[in-house]
């Protein structure tokens, strides 16, 4: 029974802490979607290079 008030206080602090932004947004912040797009295009370019270069070296550029 002595742990219940401590548990309730910790629960309330945890729930209220989720809504607080830890770091304000700056102009340098980039959306995650652009990182995904860059990764996807890089992977596609590398896969194309791996698949065609042994057959046709002109596509390696």
Swiss-Prot record:
<keyword id="KW-0165">Cleavage on pair of basic residues</keyword>
<keyword id="KW-0800">Toxin</keyword>
<keyword id="KW-0301">Gamma-carboxyglutamic acid</keyword>
<comment type="similarity">
    <text>Belongs to the conotoxin T superfamily.</text>
</comment>
<dbReference type="Pfam" id="PF16981">
    <property type="entry name" value="Chi-conotoxin"/>
</dbReference>
<keyword id="KW-0964">Secreted</keyword>
<feature type="modified residue" description="4-carboxyglutamate">
    <location>
        <position position="57"/>
    </location>
</feature>
<keyword id="KW-1015">Disulfide bond</keyword>
<dbReference type="GO" id="GO:0005576">
    <property type="term" value="C:extracellular region"/>
</dbReference>
<feature type="signal peptide">
    <location>
        <begin position="1"/>
        <end position="19"/>
    </location>
</feature>
<keyword id="KW-0732">Signal</keyword>
<dbReference type="InterPro" id="IPR031565">
    <property type="entry name" value="T-conotoxin"/>
</dbReference>
<protein>
    <recommendedName>
        <fullName>Conotoxin TeAr154</fullName>
    </recommendedName>
</protein>
<feature type="propeptide">
    <location>
        <begin position="20"/>
        <end position="47"/>
    </location>
</feature>
<dbReference type="GO" id="GO:0090729">
    <property type="term" value="F:toxin activity"/>
</dbReference>
